[in-house]
Amino acid sequence: MSWEVLTMRSATSFFNPALARSDLRRYWPVLFLYAGLWIIFLPIPVWNRAAERNPALVNLTELCADTYAAAVVLALIFGGIMATAVFSYLMQTRSVGAMHALPQRRGTLFWTHFLTGWAMLAAGNLLVLAVTALAALLGGLALTPALLTWFVVATLLDLIFLALGTLCAMVTGWLLAVPVLYAAVNCLAVALTWLGQQLAELLLDGFTMPDAQPVITRWLTPVYQLICDLGQSGPSYSPFLTGKLPDDRIQNADCASGLAPQGWRTLLIFTAVALVLTVLSRLLYGRRKSELSGDAAAFPWMRPVFRLGVGLVGGLPLGMLLYVLVSVGRSGDFSPARLCVCMAVMGIVCYLAAAMLVGKTLRVLPKRLPGAAVTALVLVLLCVGLRADVFGYADRTPQAEDVARARVYCLDTSFTLEDPRSLETLVKAQAELAENRAADMNYRMTFEVHYVL
């Protein structure tokens, strides 16, 4: 008598069709709204332009290129919405427990929800592509590769912002915190740069707000950099002195693909970053504890980072606002000491508020006093460092031979200098004024010099 054991080979997959269909049934209104808005922005203008003009005079490549800025904005909005929707089960204890009780690996759950969300947005783009092509053919327009380029651009933009939204969903356990964190990440660099420049204008002698954002700020703000390079707007496309595009600048409409090389470069760089963020989100999802759903911070190591970040980022603008409020009606010059006190107070308040939020209790004292003191100290040191000009900004002048031209603003007049001797005289005058700026503090006149190196 022999016994035979029947075995069945088990297979694991990174994608579960049943979960994908569930996401599609639940979140199809997002796809419907996304595709509907795109139909308003692209197929309808193509149809109207072909109907009101001679089709031979209508440039489909230009029409597609004109929508790139809108593509960035729509991807920003719907990428965040889709990420919040497909991972919303992580924010409730019952739903996350039920989902993780399924005989599916966490990798399968993550990739199914992520790819389904991206596929829904890509399907909307494909529908718009078909409707636009049909409208162009019915209007007598010739199809160009720019239409396919638009599809690639829109789909990659959806991936970029979906990846960013997914990362935000992985690090918090509050559903309402996901869009707040997503919005903060997308504007944090610009906001901190602006606040830092405002503080420097108060404390640093000779500092004025620049006309353009620093390069690092633009690259840390994807929506800003993508709109600049895809939509061909921003300081690099409209220099304040020349008032015209550089001679070597290639317009989107001049390219057969409908997108200039600079736009492709920026898009591919952010796509590579999005892939890295997606892998990072997958790793965080594997280490995320189900019982922490409902907490502001989904990981214990994030709590001190959150407290300190809120204390510093909140204390900076609120400290300046408090200084303005307490200085109303006071006579006298600007008081750096008063500003330091206001910054320290608001930094402590914001730090303790964040501690209460993370700890879900009002009893945070005296345990969180050291962290609050560190926050206040950092803000005070920032003010002192700017006031003392530790980097020598006020005395810094360019070399005369490196200056191509300069524009001087004084009172209600302005003029441009391009002659080398005039530029050399201007640089020397600025150096002399910076060296003797404290000679007579009772009478001061402000002028601005914009150098083009």
Please annotate each region the language model reported.
Residues A439-L453:
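Short, structured surface segments that line ligand/substrate-binding pockets
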